[in-house]
């Protein structure tokens, strides 16, 4: 009996699966992926991405919990169910060939910030040294607006809103109201640096808000 063939490099998939498992476990231990929430992906090639399957405890992932989707968000190779939010990953890979990794988490800081700032649609952060953590930035003397999109179960609507903003603004990530944060980068290290920078900056803004009363 012939072994099944797949339209992607299975050895590369195994490498990326382990990379995702190791990094996602650390994020789960930090409390950023409660109750099987969150989803994570890495570009596999110019047509496919490796992504976590839906409904799994992100602190206990195994290789079979990493599946392949095409850039239309459809499962490839195995009949597994991807996250409902897969389109929010694949739209970035399709639009930006340089993006290699997308991370989506649900930390309390991210979720609270998204709720507080949803009415104005963004959170402005400026003057922080850690703004230099974002790729292409070399100074703290700047401001960025972190978008806050309304939550919806219609990923086509949300992905269109994200695309429209990307036409006008350079982004490293965004929040969804009552939901969490998306961050991305050229590889896992880049995406994690952006994710951690957002977490730090959001935490600072929430603390300043409390102190100012």
Swiss-Prot record:
**Cofactors named for this entry:** Zn(2+)
Keywords linked to the UniProt accession: Amino-acid biosynthesis, Lyase, Metal-binding, Methionine biosynthesis, Zinc
Enzyme Commission number(s): 4.2.1.109
Q: Got a GO cellular component term for this one?
A: cytoplasm
**Cofactor: how bound:** Binds 1 zinc ion per subunit.
Which residues of the sequence carry a binding annotation for Zn(2+)?
104, 106
What Gene Ontology terms for biological process does this UniProt record contain?
L-methionine salvage from methylthioadenosine; monosaccharide metabolic process
Supply the Gene3D superfamilies for this chain. Answer: Class II aldolase/adducin N-terminal domain (3.40.225.10)
Pathway stated in the Swiss-Prot or TrEMBL entry: Amino-acid biosynthesis; L-methionine biosynthesis via salvage pathway; L-methionine from S-methyl-5-thio-alpha-D-ribose 1-phosphate: step 2/6
SMART domains for the chain? Aldolase_II
Reactions this protein catalyses: 5-(methylsulfanyl)-D-ribulose 1-phosphate = 5-methylsulfanyl-2,3-dioxopentyl phosphate + H2O
Named from the GO MF annotations, one term is: methylthioribulose 1-phosphate dehydratase activity
The protein's role, per its UniProt record: Catalyzes the dehydration of methylthioribulose-1-phosphate (MTRu-1-P) into 2,3-diketo-5-methylthiopentyl-1-phosphate (DK-MTP-1-P).
Q: Which HAMAP family match?
A: Salvage_MtnB (MF_01677)
Protein family: Belongs to the aldolase class II family. MtnB subfamily.
Instruction: Specify the protein name.
Output: Methylthioribulose-1-phosphate dehydratase
